[in-house]
């Protein structure tokens, strides 16, 4: 199990990303469409003035059962250990142990 403080930090980041998503997208679109270098510099400063944790690439994929940050399968949102144990118990519909 991951530390509760790390899980809480990640939840806080997700909320910030949601709150600033529209503003961040509009600034980035304006930055891409701007031709004048001074205008681009001004828009870039506005983007930098946003909170650091509102960038979506700072969110960490975590297992929803244990909170582990590594070995997480996107399709299930589970870490590899939980995926294996839940698949063996039949808790994941459609997942079967392979044999050939």
Curated annotation (Swiss-Prot):
Gene3D superfamilies: 1.10.287.1480. Coiled coil: none annotated. GO terms for cellular component: cytoplasm; small ribosomal subunit. One of its GO terms (molecular function) is structural constituent of ribosome. GO terms for biological process: translation. The keyword Ribosomal protein applies. Keywords: Ribonucleoprotein, Ribosomal protein, RNA-binding, rRNA-binding. SUPFAM superfamilies: Glucocorticoid receptor-like (DNA-binding domain). It comes from the Bacteria. Pfam families: Ribosomal_S14. Belongs to the universal ribosomal protein uS14 family. Binds 16S rRNA, required for the assembly of 30S particles and may also be responsible for determining the conformation of the 16S rRNA at the A site. Part of the 30S ribosomal subunit. Contacts proteins S3 and S10. NCBIfam families: PRK08881.1. This is Small ribosomal subunit protein uS14. It comes from Prochlorococcus marinus (strain NATL1A). The lineage of its organism: Bacteria, Bacillati, Cyanobacteriota, Cyanophyceae, Synechococcales. The gene is rpsN.
